[in-house]
Amino acid sequence: MFVNARRYDRFLEDVHIPEPENLFSPPNGSVASRGFGSGLGLHHHAPWRLGARLGISNQLDERAYVKSCYQKYLKRYLRCVKGIDDNVKRLIDYLKETGELENTVIIYTGDQGFFLGEHDLMDKRWIYEESFRMPFIVHAPQLIQPASSNDWLINNTDFAPTILELAGLEKTPDYMQGRSFMGAFQAQPKPLNWRTSTYYRYWMHMAHSLKTPAHFGIRSERYKLIFFYGCTPEGRNQTPVAWEFYDLLKDPQEMVNEYKNPKYQSTIESLKAELDQVRGNLKETDEKYPHIQKIIAANWNQ
């Protein structure tokens, strides 16, 4: 749970925080994902109850319970973030005072995204967009047009090569997997050989009290394909196995699993081939885990 600076204990106390559109619409994804993970509602498999920690009565109906959870949860989060903002300001003020602001690149990022009620979920771990996407905000007026953005597919393995190039290194060391995306800062065209998809895996099956099933998948510029294999590396604690597929252009909130839609079958087959190739390139073939290999083989064409 978030712990804020005491000076913000009453911040936003009388404010109603707007709710995400899909707060009351858990994804119709698949039997492998429905009800799993940690969330705001009472229907999740996870024993961890946010409402209990926030002092919310479980005698409320589901909708009232979730609404109350959301308001208290978001206010705790935003109170904590308010303190972080204060310290970012302190840093910027110091750089101004020392005359180094224009000689400094400030990067604000994280190791993953985070659910704040979307899909009736909290925490991270899932391949869904709110968790999968990472914040990456850069202040460098000498390099970047303010308020600009770009659509390059970037991985966190690209962070180090980019920072090294910003520091003056001309060539990324061969032992690094990532690539510099400094060209994106300068509004250069995306290189023709830039990646068109990215891979994700969550292997800590049903770990801790958060109960997120193991899965892997691939996200292209428009589509996302996910395979829930649902077990530990040793094959224990099996949960349902299923595929999910989303058209992120038509369904950016990932509410409709189109895996069985005939319209998308050729796209799905192409993504499966790409997913298989990427897993091979990354040595993610589960050779040491034959139980997982059997699940993949049995369900690859299902």
Language-model features, listed with the residues they occupy:
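Mature extracytoplasmic/periplasmic domains
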Residues: 261-264, 287-293
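Inter-blade boundary loops/turns of WD-repeat beta-propellers
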Residues: 139, 248-250
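Non-transmembrane alpha-helical segments in soluble domains
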Residues: 9, 13, 78-81, 85-96, ...
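Active-site-proximal cap/lid insertion segments
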Residues: 1-154, 166-175, 234-240, 262-266, ...
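C-terminal cap/loop subdomain of S1 sulfatases and analogous C-terminal strand-loop tails that border
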Residues: 112-118, 157-160, 165-244, 248, ...
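C-terminal helix-rich "cap/oligomerization" subdomain common to oxidoreductases
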Residues: 271, 275-291
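Short clusters of small/polar residues that mark proteolytic maturation junctions
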Residues: 120, 229, 257-259
